[in-house]
Amino acid sequence: MIFALLFFAAIAIGWVASMVGVGGGIFMVPLLVFLNSVSTTQEAVGTSLAAIVFNSISSTIAYSRQKKIDYKFALALLPMALVGAWLGAFLTEFISSDALAIAFGVLLLYVSGLMLAGKEPKELGLLLRRGLDPHGNPKPILGALVGLVAGVAAGFFGIGGGIVMVPAMNIFLGVDIVNAVATSLFVMGPSSLIAAVTHFFQGNLHIDLALPLALGIIIGAQLGAWSTTRVSKIFLRRLFGVVLLYSAVNMIWKGVQGVL
């Protein structure tokens, strides 16, 4: 029963996650906790990370066929994203995350509003033009910066890097929303794999739960990538805005609970 439930839920999660460039952990972790399938939140995180690896692989295959992945920019993002993830996790030992979670959540609320507006990056007037080359493509140095910020946020707050990477690439660097989604999903593969392996050796990864999630998310990711060719870019921005709004409210709520 639980196998089938997680499998079909993962198809839906993978479908949405692949369309907006996130791993899907923001949905899988609360699902596993709600179903009482795990004893701790860390076990839910570790198990969901294993599925996220397969979301990245499946999405990368689909988006590479569409030629939507900016590999040059991704290679600038990836190393600093890994460094940032380590740095973020390291900082949790010294800095209370509750107050910062509230502040970061408020920032995400603002960004979600920008995405929900559905406007083109140029219409928002927030493009960092000095960070673009003569052809309008983002410079690698900005890719490294985006990767670092996304990595630190992921390591410190336990959120997916796509929550930072997609809006940063689309709103501030003018990268096409589908390209931003595809590149984000490609980048999160290696970092999710490292995190999943770490959780496995810590005993936080349940193979029996990760298997149906992975199988479902592989299918969902293919459906999500296919769907991006059937919907408007305004719809994609607004869909991401909804996902981001959910993440922001969830982060603020957890921060408030920690403070109180």
Regions found by a protein language model. Give the residues of each.
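Conserved N-terminal glycine/acidic-rich loop preference
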Residues: L6-I13, A17-V22, F27, L49-S56
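Short hydrophobic/aromatic, small-residue-rich stretches within specific transmembrane helices
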Residues: S48-I52, S184-M188, L209-A214
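Small-residue hotspots at the loop-to-helix junctions and early N-terminal turns
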Residues: T41-V45, V181, L185
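Hydrophobic, membrane-facing alpha-helical anchors
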Residues: M1-L6, L49-I61, P134-H135, I159-A168
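Membrane-embedded alpha-helical segments of transport systems
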Residues: A50-S58, V83-G84, V187-I194
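Alpha-helical transmembrane segments of polytopic integral membrane proteins
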Residues: G25, V29, F54-I57, L109, ...
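Juxtamembrane transmembrane-helix boundary motif
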Residues: M1-V16, V29, V33-T41, I61-A153, ...
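Transmembrane helix boundary and interhelical junction motifs in multipass membrane proteins
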Residues: V20-L31, G158-A168
